């Protein structure tokens, strides 16, 4: 046995020398902490590294997670003798120490980390051989109603462990249309748009799906796979808009009054109403059972119909489905009397008016609903004043209100005016209206133009609209200021486009010819206009309009070089924001009145997204479009004459970008500062919110959440709360007092699905009164206690020195005074 071991060591040594491991560098070196990566499943007896011994070390010792796989020879050769398995242990933590001849550690031990790299040696496996679920008809497309889950023991951070789900077959398959779809990454099953519209439990109450899962992200021919079966029951969706409601106006019943109801499919929904029209007064409410009420009497004359939305939300305020449209029609009651068109309605009648001729029509109004009995009016003459030469000179059509002459006995000199009182009634109300009928002279004179030819007039085609270009005049010898003498001017020839009009002065009968529409040299350079003057009252029998009532006029329009004219003031186009570069996104058209060619250009393309064909006006994309950066995207289009004076005109082009799923999810806000108090007494959790910049309309985002790395699964778990919120929870309480960065993978379930990996920093720290306590360090510029004591002692020392100097100086001054006193007494002369 000993001989066999020595032989094995000798073979390794020879292999080691033959392959160059003995050279200092990549494969050999001094004893120090090191990390090695080795693929699992490789042949054993592979040399990993040669450690060099420094005297007095003569041999090496290996400890740690060797699993009887890793061995170190006395000479320092580290190798493994069996194939590694990442799924058994992904990391081996070893320690190597150098020993002297007596077996005493003289160097180390140092950590040696062996990381086992993954190979694709495990097939994915569904957690269940069969799944069952249910979905309601008309459920929102893309909203998951069931998840299938598979596991793969390979490393999820590599393609080996990345799973790809797909639907193999749908049974039954109706018209070759897929009603179901699956998120390739998460296994979330939802309805397609066709499934949302066409699923009907009355026709097909159940479906079966065969789902496959592949590893290698489904991108390799050598992928391992597994399949499972999914049985789906289609249930009726009771979240449906109710039938339109009719509510009688001005109801005197106690309010609120229940008028209809909506119901979500499951209990616990929170209901609300949304005023679609943003009315200042919204007279409806809904309770938490889904019953809808009118809260006050309605007035049909104020508003005859209401349209609003009923919304169902979950406990977090997120919509459960699309809102339902509620229609309420206000039913009319007869609560309005007829009204007269004016206090007094005036008509004129010629004294020789023929029997039965129409004098005029009295049109009363009723605010109740049109074309119903409530607004159906009857007319009746109740009084004629004066009754000369007899009563009953006039009659009125009962339902039309048209007044007619009943008897041919009118004479202006005897009775120039009649007053009628007319009763207008609906089925419940009556109103009196007053009509004044003026008897006027017979219309036996025609209008006569003062001249029959108003000559020629030359105008530029850009003459302003509203300009008066000509004054015409006709006279009438009938009774002044009556319908027999009033003159109306009409253009009967030469202006088929209606570019001109004539206004009449009622006091002078003067006609003013004005420009109503732009003149155009290109279509009407010369117009031969014919005017006709006539009265609003009919002429008496035997009198007809003749040439005296007609006049002519020639209008000559001169050319003006006009700018090109766009066919529209604003052009709009709608495209998906992910269209390929070079795609035609719209076009504009303009014409030059003079027929010149036009060159198109763009102005205000601040993002450089578009180009325009200068000849055809077709607009193309030249860069990636982004709805989130700007939609609608507004630019100006310039049309310029080619040649001539190069006049130009400008129109707007609005490009509406339809959203695609091109923004990965992210955290809704900065979550710096999340913490748990250390040590944990029980597992804890934190709630966070995700968002993205794509458009979600009513349904809002529906994210799914998972941990961003398989290495986090022992410490953390993440669970979905709703479409935007999730809970991060600890799996145990044994955390160190430090900051952890937890990676979260967020999938938006869109088409195509996008994922974002975000970081949540979570700190485990000591707490004081529920807050994270971090000891304050020394701050630059603030003295420490030692510094303060030093400053104080220095100050006292300086004061002491100053006092000592002062005292010494005082003492010296005293000594000097004493000497001077002594000397003075010694020289004083003696007296005898």
UniProtKB/Swiss-Prot annotation:
Bilayer topology term: Single-pass type I membrane protein
Record domain Cadherin: where: 30-128, 129-244, 245-340, 341-449, 450-566, 567-667, 668-777
Entry comment describing in which tissues the protein is expressed: Expressed in the gastrointestinal tract and pancreatic duct. Not detected in kidney, lung, liver, brain, adrenal gland and skin.
Transmembrane intervals: 788-808
Chain positions carrying an annotated carbohydrate: 149, 184, 250, 419, 456, 546, 587, 722
UniProt entry keywords in alphabetical sequence: Calcium, Cell adhesion, Cell membrane, Glycoprotein, Membrane, Metal-binding, Repeat, Signal, Transmembrane, Transmembrane helix, Transport
PANTHER family: CADHERIN-17, CADHERIN-23
Protein name (Swiss-Prot/TrEMBL): Cadherin-17
Organism of derivation: Homo sapiens (Human)
Gene from which the chain derives: CDH17
């Amino acid at each position: 046995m000993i001989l066999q071991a020595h032989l094995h060591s000798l073979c390794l040594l020879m292999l080691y020398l033959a392959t160059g491991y003995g050279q200092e560098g990549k494969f050999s070196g001094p004893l120090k902490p090191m990390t090695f990566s080795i693929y699992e499943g490789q042949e054993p007896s592979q040399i990993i590294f040669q450690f060099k011994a420094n005297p007095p070390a003569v041999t090496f010792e290996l400890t740690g997670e060797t699993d009887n796989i890793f061995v170190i020879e006395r000479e320092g050769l580290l190798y493994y003798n069996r194939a590694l398995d990442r799924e058994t242990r992904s990391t081996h933590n070893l320690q190597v120490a150098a020993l002297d001849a007596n077996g005493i550690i003289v160097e180390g031990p140092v950590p040696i980390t062996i990381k086992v790299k993954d190979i694709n040696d495990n097939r994915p496996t569904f957690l269940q051989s069969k799944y069952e679920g249910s979905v309601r008809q008309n459920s929102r497309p893309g909203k998951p109603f069931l998840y299938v889950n598979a596991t793969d023991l390979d490393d999820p951070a590599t393609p080996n462990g990345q799973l790809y789900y797909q639907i193999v077959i749908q049974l039954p398959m109706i018209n070759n249309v897929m009603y179901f779809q699956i998120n390739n990454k998460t296994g979330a099953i939802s309805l397609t748009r066709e499934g949302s519209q066409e699923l009907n439990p009355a026709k097909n109450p159940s479906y079966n799906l065969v789902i496959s899962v592949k590893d290698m992200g489904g991108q390799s021919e050598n992928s391992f796979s597994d399949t499972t079966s999914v049985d789906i029951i289609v249930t009726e969706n009771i979240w449906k808009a109710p039938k339109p409601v009719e509510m009688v106006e001005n109801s005197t019943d106690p309010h609120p009054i229940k008028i209809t109801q909506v119901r979500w499919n499951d209990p616990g929904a929170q209901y609300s109403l949304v005023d679609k029209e943003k009315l200042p007064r919204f007279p409806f409410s809904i309770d938490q059972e889904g019953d809808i009420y009118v809260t006050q009497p309605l007035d049909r004359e104020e508003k005859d119909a209401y349209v609003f939305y009923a919304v169902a939300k979950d406990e977090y305020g997120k919509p459960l489905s699309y809102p339902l449209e509620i229609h309420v029609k206000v039913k009319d009651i007869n609560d309005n009397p007829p009204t007269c068109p004016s206090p007094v309605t005036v008509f004129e009648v010629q004294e020789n008016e023929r029997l039965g001729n129409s004098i005029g029509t009295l049109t009363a109004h009723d605010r109740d609903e049109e074309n119903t009995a409530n607004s159906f009016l009857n007319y009746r003459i109740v009084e004629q004043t004066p009754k000369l030469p007899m009563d009953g000179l006039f009659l009125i059509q009962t339902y039309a209100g048209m007044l007619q002459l009943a008897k041919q006995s009118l004479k202006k000199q005897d009775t120039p005016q009649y007053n009628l009182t007319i009763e207008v009634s609906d089925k419940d109300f009556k109103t009196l209206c007053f009509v004044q009928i003026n008897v006027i002279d017979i219309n036996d004179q025609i209008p006569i133009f003062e001249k029959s030819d108003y000559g020629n007039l030359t105008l530029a085609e850009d003459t302003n609209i509203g300009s008066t270009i000509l004054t015409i005049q006709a006279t009438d010898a009938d009774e002044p200021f009556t319908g027999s003498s009033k003159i109306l001017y009409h253009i009967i020839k030469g202006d088929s486009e209606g570019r001109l009009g004539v206004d009449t002065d009622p006091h002078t009968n003067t006609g003013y010819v004005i420009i109503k529409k732009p003149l155009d040299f290109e279509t009407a350079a010369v117009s031969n206009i014919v005017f006709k003057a006539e009265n609003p009252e009919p002429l008496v029998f035997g009198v007809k309009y003749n040439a005296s009532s007609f006049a002519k006029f020639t209008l000559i329009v001169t050319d003006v070089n006009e700018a090109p004219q766009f066919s529209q003031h604003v052009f709009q186009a709608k495209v998906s924001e992910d269209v390929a570069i070079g795609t035609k996104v719209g076009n504009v058209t303009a014409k030059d009145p003079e027929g010149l060619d036009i060159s198109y250009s763009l102005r205000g393309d601040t993002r450089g997204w578009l180009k325009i064909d200068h000849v055809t006006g077709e607009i193309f994309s030249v860069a990636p479009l982004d709805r989130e950066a700007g939609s609608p995207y507004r630019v100006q289009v310039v049309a310029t004459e080619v040649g001539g004076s190069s006049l130009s005109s400008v129109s707007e082009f609005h490009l509406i970008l339809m959203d695609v799923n091109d923004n990965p999810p992210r955290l809704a806000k900065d979550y710096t500062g999340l913490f748990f108090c250390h040590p944990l007494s029980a597992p804890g959790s934190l709630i966070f919110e995700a968002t993205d910049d794509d458009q979600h309309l009513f349904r809002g985002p529906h994210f799914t959440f998972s941990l961003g790395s398989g290495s986090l699964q022992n410490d953390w778990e993440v669970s979905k709360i709703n479409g935007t919120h999730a809970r991060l929870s600890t799996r145990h309480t044994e955390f160190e007092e430090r900051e952890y960065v937890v990676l979260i993978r967020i999938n938006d379930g869109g088409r195509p699905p996008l994922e974002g990996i975000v970081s949540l920093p979570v700190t485990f720290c000591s707490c004081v009164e529920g807050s994270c306590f971090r000891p304050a360090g020394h701050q630059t510029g603030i003295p420490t206690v030692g510094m303060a004591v030093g400053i104080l002692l220095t100050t006292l020392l300086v004061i002491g020195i100053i006092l000592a100097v002062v005292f010494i100086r005082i003492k010296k001054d005293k000594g000097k005074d004493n000497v001077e006193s002594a000397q003075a007494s010694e020289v004083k002369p003696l007296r005898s």
